[in-house]
């Protein structure tokens, strides 16, 4: 018979997603009986004279005195869960036997050298937790990023109804490919702390290895799979981080450096790497929870600075709009929303998603990729490569020899290319327009610098009062020197453009020659 607690236990069916179900303790959770948020009371049990129930398990039912530091750390761990789920924790005072969650402070002898145990909802001794101060180096919870803090968040996950991804606790399925509790990260490497704090492989284990002794560099929040699971049970905290928030990438390996999963309920938000002293990777895509679609991205995409044992992933359904890179060589990736992506100094690669993005490379030789959407791509100083892809994009090369590139990977289609504006084409700076033969399939020009004379023509006249579109020319690339329009004339002298058409306008209407192009195989 389960221990009596303030709240009743309810149960939800499994979701059908093994990466959520694998960390659900059979779907059991503490029910609020319709009130919102779910209010869960807790008590620090620190009196050896308290008459706590002796009937649950083989572990100590007396507790050592909790220190203020230990209490504060556990409260921070509770707050980490309350930040993401529709839960409100209430401290009802020390030594309250009836509290839903009762927290023991024990030692190695009392806990057989185990770091922590928490009985999940619906089990004998439900809500009773044991934290081993000795096994955790003298502090029961420690600082964020330490193994002690990981244990605190992990055990509180059990307290709320979560299970391990490596075993069948509560009837949960094991994560695909996981063969043991330690060291086995399973298919796609998803059994590790960067994706779920319920794993026994803390931190970014597959990249950084075992860092349990550092005192930093592990996860400090529930991670993407944990957040999805706990929100399935209790609902979302839609009041957390509703303003315009900035998340700064950790830039130093020190106490407090950690990985965290961003749960943000609103506002226009930014991941900022400007303080980093090395290359950064920033990816604004959220954890999809779908391995078939996104592989390991189901558990989130890691944003971090090179050599630093900390960073961010983004929880499912969270929108982070903007990214700011460092002054080194960064990789910045946008999402499906309207992003403002800034590279700053360094030779950066910046790629937008499906939204209408503004992408600014800053100083350095950058590669800017717009993808779907009507994007604004700004090279800044340096020799940049600018790729718009689909959408009607605006290209601003800035100072330096820039390449405005067109290569969709397939034959030219207007929807794939759009009608772009090249704002500042400057031959004297070495600017070029690069055309791929895999896209501009009618070109006869050999790969290399310059179009063949037969492939390029300049139009200066009107036909029947409309701009000459190249319908009467054999050239495949036709430039209208009156208005800066640049056409792909796939059909040559035949009527119409075939699948081609206007693909760019050089708004400064420069002089253009066949030598201003590069042909790519």
Language-model segments: what does each one mean?
Residues 53-95, 266, 272-277:
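Zn2+-dependent metallopeptidase catalytic core
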Residues 150-165:
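Active-site recognition of the HExxH zinc-binding catalytic motif
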Residues 62, 138-142, 146-147, 170-184, ...:
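Acidic, glycine-rich calcium-binding repeat modules characteristic of RTX/beta-roll
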Residues 47-49, 97, 107-110, 136-137, ...:
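Acidic glycine-/aspartate-rich tracts in secreted/extracellular proteins
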Residues 221, 305-309, 317, 321, ...:
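Low-complexity acidic/polar repeat-biased segments
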Residues 1-66:
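Disordered inhibitory propeptide/activation segment of secreted metzincin zinc metalloprotease zymogens
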Residues 44-47, 118-144, 319:
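Active-site scaffold of zinc-dependent metalloenzymes
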Residues 35, 105-128, 181-184:
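Catalytic zinc-binding patch centered on the HExxH motif and its immediate surroundings
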């Amino acid at each position: 018979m389960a221990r009596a607690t303030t709240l009743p236990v309810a149960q939800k069916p499994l979701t059908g997603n093994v990466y959520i179900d694998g960390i659900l303790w059979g779907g059991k959770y503490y029910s609020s009986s319709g009130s919102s948020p779910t209010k869960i009371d807790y008590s620090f049990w620190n009196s050896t004279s308290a008459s706590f129930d002796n009937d649950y398990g083989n572990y100590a039912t007396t507790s050592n005195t909790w220190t203020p530091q230990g209490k504060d750390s556990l409260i921070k761990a509770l707050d980490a869960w309350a930040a993401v789920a529709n839960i409100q924790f209430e401290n009802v005072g020390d030594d309250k036997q009836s509290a839903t969650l009762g927290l023991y402070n024990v030692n190695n002898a009392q806990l057989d050298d185990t770091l922590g145990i928490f009985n999940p909802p619906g089990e004998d001794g439900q809500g009773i937790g044991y934290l081993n101060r000795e096994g955790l180096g003298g502090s029961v919870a420690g600082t964020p990023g330490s193994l002690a803090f990981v244990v605190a968040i992990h055990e509180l996950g059990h307290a709320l109804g979560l299970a391990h991804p490596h075993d069948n606790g509560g009837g949960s399925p094991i994560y695909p490919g996981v063969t043991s509790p330690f060291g086995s990260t399973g298919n796609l490497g998803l059994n590790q702390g960067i994706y779920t704090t319920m794993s026994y492989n803390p931190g970014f284990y597959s990249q950084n290895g075992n860092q349990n002794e550092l005192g930093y560099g592990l996860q400090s929040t529930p991670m993407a799979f944990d957040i999805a699971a706990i929100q399935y049970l209790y609902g979302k905290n839609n009041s957390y981080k509703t303003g315009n928030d900035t998340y700064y990438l950790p830039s130093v390996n020190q106490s407090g450096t950690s990985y965290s999963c961003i749960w943000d309920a609103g506002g226009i938000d930014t991941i900022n790497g400007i303080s980093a002293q090395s290359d950064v990777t920033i990816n604004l895509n959220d954890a999809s929870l779908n391995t078939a679609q996104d592989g390991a991205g189901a558990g989130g995409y890691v944003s971090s600075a090179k050599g630093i044992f900390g960073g961010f992933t983004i929880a499912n359904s969270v929108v982070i709009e903007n990214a700011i890179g460092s002054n080194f060589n960064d990789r910045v990736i946008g999402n499906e929303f309207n992003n403002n992506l800034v590279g700053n100094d360094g030779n950066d690669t910046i790629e937008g998603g499906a939204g209408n993005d503004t992408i600014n490379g800053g100083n350095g030789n950058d590669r800017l990729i717009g993808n779907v959407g009507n994007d604004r791509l700004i090279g800044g100083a340096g020799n940049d490569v600018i790729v718009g892809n689909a959408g009607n994009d605006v290209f601003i090369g800035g100072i330096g020899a820039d390449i405005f590139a067109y290569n969709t990977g397939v034959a030219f289609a207007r929807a794939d290319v759009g009608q772009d504006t090249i704002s500042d084409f400057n031959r004297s700076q070495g600017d070029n327009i690069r055309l791929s033969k895999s896209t501009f399939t009618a070109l006869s020009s050999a790969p290399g610098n310059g179009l063949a004379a037969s492939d390029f023509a300049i139009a200066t006249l009107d036909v029947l009062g409309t701009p000459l579109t190249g319908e009467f020319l054999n050239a495949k690339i036709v430039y209208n020197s009156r208005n800066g329009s640049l056409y792909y004339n796939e059909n040559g002298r035949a009527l119409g453009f075939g699948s081609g058409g206007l693909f760019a306008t050089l708004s400064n209407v420069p002089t253009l020659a066949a030598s201003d192009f590069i042909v790519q195989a």
